[in-house]
């Protein structure tokens, strides 16, 4: 059951629910293809492509070597207001022991700390913000390599 605060944002949740399966697929793909800090080449490409498909206003890559930054301007971007949202993309050097179809395909490396989920959630935020633009200011979406 959603809290009253979340119910007030029912339109946002309904909108995001429309592309939730795509976010799950992205998270599972990233989980299956973990990369260590500052080696997130595949992850960076996937993020860049997802942001392009979302329709963000700007995409900057190679930030901190493998990081990606997306920029979305709201309906009133001239206000000078700006917010940054961040997700970390790197994996850990540990062996995955589950047997899910999306388990790590790389021996001794896995997303054991949720960074695949953080990345997918920030892509979801980027898509929602780009599709609705129902905010005042600019949102900067930072996909950080090497936490």
Across the structure, where does each feature detected by a protein language model lie?
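Acidic/His- and Gly-rich active-site-bordering loop/insert found
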Residues: 2-111, 120-123, 127-137
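Acidic, glycine-rich active-site loops and adjacent beta-strand->loop/helix elements
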Residues: 89-91, 116, 142-147
